[in-house]
Amino acid sequence: MAGSPELVVLDPPWDKELAAGTESQALVSATPREDFRVRCTSKRAVTEMLQLCGRFVQKLGDALPEEIREPALRDAQWTFESAVQENISINGQAWQEASDNCFMDSDIKVLEDQFDEIIVDIATKRKQYPRKILECVIKTIKAKQEILKQYHPVVHPLDLKYDPDPAPHMENLKCRGETVAKEISEAMKSLPALIEQGEGFSQVLRMQPVIHLQRIHQEVFSSCHRKPDAKPENFITQIETTPTETASRKTSDMVLKRKQTKDCPQRKWYPLRPKKINLDT
């Protein structure tokens, strides 16, 4: 259909401008923001510069009347310092974030010079002081020796009294010598008796373990082999005696015979011996 009308859509111009504005904002947000602040390396140097410029700001207030001079200068000084602080960066940091401990090249140079002076001073003292110390030590030792030479201790003499008549002292010594001689002689006389007693005591001490051992053996073997009860008739023996009225009495030695028992192991340890009984004693 050739005669039919065609529809044409026309975009308003303000829509194109809005779209272009949104695209430019997106590009700005995507690209990193450029820092237009002045880059500095030392906060201390900037502070010194502000103090130097503050003098010129003070001179600008000379033309103002006195009523408004002081507040106007204070506001101008604050505005100037704030503007400088906002438009500079200290090592990439803002003024408030930067620290005051940054050293300038001049400060480092001064510190290096002071350090070199200290090293030279220490090296000089190391060479000079040992000699001075040695001299002082030698002088001190010599002074001590001189003091010891001048020291003389005070010695008070002791008065010794001489006795012109030594006879009483000789008599006293003689009496004491006789007494000591008597005591020594008595001690020498009693010495053999003491030696004999000591030997007897030592023999008793040596026999004590033997007696104790014999008792132990006797108890052990008597418990192993117990003898039967013997009748009292076996122990009765007739003993011939003479009456006490007779003047002459014959000595008679009689042997008491025990009843022989069978051989047992304790015979080896304790053999029986015939015992003689003397009736005269």
Swiss-Prot record:
Signal sequence annotation: none
Official protein name in the record: Kinetochore-associated protein NSL1 homolog
GO CC terms, sorted: cytosol; kinetochore; MIS12/MIND type complex; nuclear speck; nucleus; outer kinetochore; spindle pole
The UniProt record lists the keyword Signal: no
Its biological purpose: Part of the MIS12 complex which is required for normal chromosome alignment and segregation and kinetochore formation during mitosis.
InterPro entries linked to this entry: Mis14/Nsl1
Species per Swiss-Prot/TrEMBL record: Homo sapiens
Oligomeric form and interacting partners: Component of the MIS12 complex composed of MIS12, DSN1, NSL1/DC8 and PMF1. Interacts with KNL1.
Annotated compartments: Nucleus; Chromosome, Centromere, Kinetochore
Residue(s) carrying Phosphothreonine: T244
